[in-house]
A protein has these predicted regions:
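Short glycine-rich anion-binding loops that position phosphate/pyrophosphate groups of nucleotides
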Residues: 10-12, 107-109, 129-130, 175
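Active-site ligand-binding patch in enzyme domains
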Residues: 1-100, 109-112
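Structured beta->alpha junctions
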Residues: 79-82, 129, 160
Length: 177
């Protein structure tokens, strides 16, 4: 399993996830990392209802200083100069903490930011054989590619059927042997 699971405030606000592994056998829970650029995370979020450590990465101070986190939560400030969290600095920090396998479970905005920064080694895509139409959400919010030489390239690593769904593993082409 992953050493850390990372998500952003869009996912916290939309889904209120716990971000813990729910397996039958006991395991060490991953470090739950919340990217909270604007310091808006509430101590009432569901992720604080379960055991395990939480790391909150922000670009500046918290807005509501009276809404204190408990002792399981550490806050770090990693500004990128444009009001967002410096994602490369966050990955470096997780590496210093010996978190070498990090799961990004996020919406299109944060997933796109990690992809655009070249911080994705592998994509695990779960694909259902259902069409949602034009109202369906995209996986990555990325700038338009003006020429194919600037596209993000991946190699198919593995395709596995899980019931009706497919699990597709893609590796970033820069890691090609």
């Amino acid at each position: 399993g992953s050493c850390a699971v990372v998500t952003g405030m869009g996912t916290v606000n939309a889904d209120n996830p716990r971000l813990n592994a729910r397996l039958t056998e006991p395991i060490v829970q991953p470090l739950r990392v919340i990217i909270d650029s604007k310091g808006q995370l509430s101590s009432k979020a569901a992720l604080f209802d379960v055991d395990g450590s939480v790391l909150v990465a922000s670009a500046g101070p918290r807005r509501d200083k009276s809404d204190a986190f408990d002792s399981r939560t550490e806050s770090i400030t990693l500004p990128d100069g444009s009001g967002r969290v410096d994602l490369a600095a966050l990955i470096d920090e997780l590496g210093r903490r010996r978190c070498n396998e990090v799961l990004i479970e996020a919406g299109a905005g944060l997933a796109g930011a990690f992809a655009a920064a070249g911080l994705i080694d592998e994509l695990l895509i779960y694909l259902a054989p259902d069409l949602l139409g034009s109202g369906g959400r995209g996986m990555f919010a990325l700038p338009e590619v003006v020429s194919l030489e600037h596209r993000l390239r991946f190699e198919v690593n593995q395709v596995k059927q899980l019931g009706r769904d497919l699990r597709v593993s893609l590796r970033a082409e820069r890691w090609k042997a």
